[in-house]
Amino acid sequence: MYSIYSGGFSLVRSLLKKYNIKGGTFDQHFLVDAGYLDRIVAAAELGPKDVVLEIGAGVGNLTERLAKKVKKVIAIELDPVLVRVLHDRFDKVGNIEIIAGDALKVEFPEFDKIVSNLPYSISSEITFKLLRHKFKLGILMYQYEFAARMVSQPNCKDYSRLTVDTCYFADASILMKVPKSAFQPAPEVDSAVIKLVPRPVPFEVKDQAFFMNFVSAVFSQRRKKLRNAILNTNYLLKIPNIKEVISRLPEDMMSKRAENLTPEELAQVANHIIDLKTSILANELNE
């Protein structure tokens, strides 16, 4: 049996009043526009065998729509008051599992798709965690500026570590922009829905852990040429014989900034470093 509540704004207003929820705590901005909710669900291409993860389930507007179309919804919520709302609404719904906890700390169960209005304050951390988890499709709401960074291109101001990390794991595209007015209470900025489709890495990476560390390091020095960015962050990268290694890296790339290089070019530099480290270590052993 599904909740007797219907509608968007009226549902949220009644629940906020009933449970004395002030809004704003735990990054609470509930998507209430039925049109956008329906478009998000449609974009997920849900089927009766799907297991769907929802992070930041809130009062359950999206949860309810998802549960009507899939085998199971796993709804994670941190706020104990909202957890109580979800239990009150859905304890009699057999295909909704409610997990009370911090999505950054909870070990995700197996799922096929993730459909969520993500808490904006943890956008980076939760995205990096999700990208390392196996799933088929993600339909995710972010602040618009964050979404723009995910799909940016080299030489653009939004191009960042997040762009490269996203590109490494998945194809990403912005499906729709969502205005502040679609939420209750309204956030200060507009939002966007991103479609994430995981796929094999589209370029060679010889050491994933080093590549990710390398990207993080050089983008922390995004205004520096790559040569100086590597030198300045070698306390993180721990490259032996760093000056010799840099002298043997491609000059055309060393004279550019991280923000000027494609993800594949950054991978090529990281691969060169791995090869040089191996070569230097081998020479030292033979001496």
UniProtKB/Swiss-Prot annotation:
Concerning Pfam families, the annotation shows: RrnaAD (PF00398)
| Stated family | Belongs to the class I-like SAM-binding methyltransferase superfamily. rRNA adenine N(6)-methyltransferase family. RsmA subfamily.
Task: Give the subcellular location.
Answer: Cytoplasm
InterPro entries the record matches: KsgA/Erm, rRNA_Ade_diMease-like_C, rRNA_Ade_Mease_Trfase_CS, rRNA_Ade_methylase_Trfase_N, rRNA_adenine_dimethylase, SAM-dependent_MTases_sf
Question: Do you know which PANTHER family this protein is assigned to?
Answer: DIMETHYLADENOSINE TRANSFERASE, DIMETHYLADENOSINE TRANSFERASE-RELATED
Species name: Methanosarcina barkeri (strain Fusaro / DSM 804)
Quote the CDD domains the UniProt record gives: AdoMet_MTases
What does this gene product do? Specifically dimethylates two adjacent adenosines in the loop of a conserved hairpin near the 3'-end of 16S rRNA in the 30S particle. May play a critical role in biogenesis of 30S subunits.
Q: What is its EC number?
A: 2.1.1.-
* Recorded superkingdom: Archaea
Write out the GO cellular component annotations.
Answer: cytoplasm
Going by the UniProt record, its keywords in alphabetical order are: Cytoplasm, Methyltransferase, RNA-binding, rRNA processing, S-adenosyl-L-methionine, Transferase
What GO MF annotations does this protein's record show?
Answer: RNA binding; rRNA (adenine-N6,N6-)-dimethyltransferase activity
Read off the NCBIfam families from this record.
Answer: ksgA
What SMART domains does the record tag this protein with?
rADc
What residues bind S-adenosyl-L-methionine, as annotated? H29, L31, G56, E77, D102, N117
Q: What name appears for this protein in its UniProt entry?
A: Probable ribosomal RNA small subunit methyltransferase A
| Top EC class, one word | transferase
